[in-house]
Amino acid sequence: DELGLAFDKTVNERLKGVSRERSFEIILEVNGAQETFLSEDKAKFIDKKNEYYKALIKQVTSKDILPGVMDFLNESKKQGILLAVASASKNARTVLEGLGILSMFDYVADASKIRYTKPDPEVFIDCMEHLKLQPWECIAFEDAAAGIEAIQAANIAAVGIGASVKPAVPDVFLDNTEELSIEKIENLLYK
């Protein structure tokens, strides 16, 4: 708002799964304003945007967990499935803590632990290595096209959730998190 740059739901969907810097570049591209800001100014605005974001995520609670996610996590833990989070955000742990589900995950890989962000597969490879798993032993879930590309580059089965995974083509597509179920995903992947 304060920069006079257009930002709507469509733009927001493009920002999923990419770094802070790339997010700002996308916003500038959409507005035809790539040349408007000096590098120092870009860095200031990226920091300011992150401060707004950090203030917002401090308000996250268990009420913000998407439908179907808690049942899926509980079902996974009950079956002894190792769970990891592969996030492009440095704030992943804070969000998981706010949601009250951090303890459900065996590992959290985020932008503070990796050099390259999605669509590079590094964050997924980091999760596999930490959990001592091979790609064929993993299934990864994503709500962003860059994430689907990263999963596939790591040779992991990709489950895309929601329309924002397009134009990427996951191995399994779910309309929303309410469709999450181990049985359903196994049936779709291994039919």
Language model: regions and residue ranges:
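N-terminal helical cap/lid subdomain that shapes the substrate entry/recognition surface
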Residues: 1-70, 75-79, 94
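Short, intrinsically disordered/low-complexity patches at protein termini
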Residues: 31-32, 60, 82, 148, ...
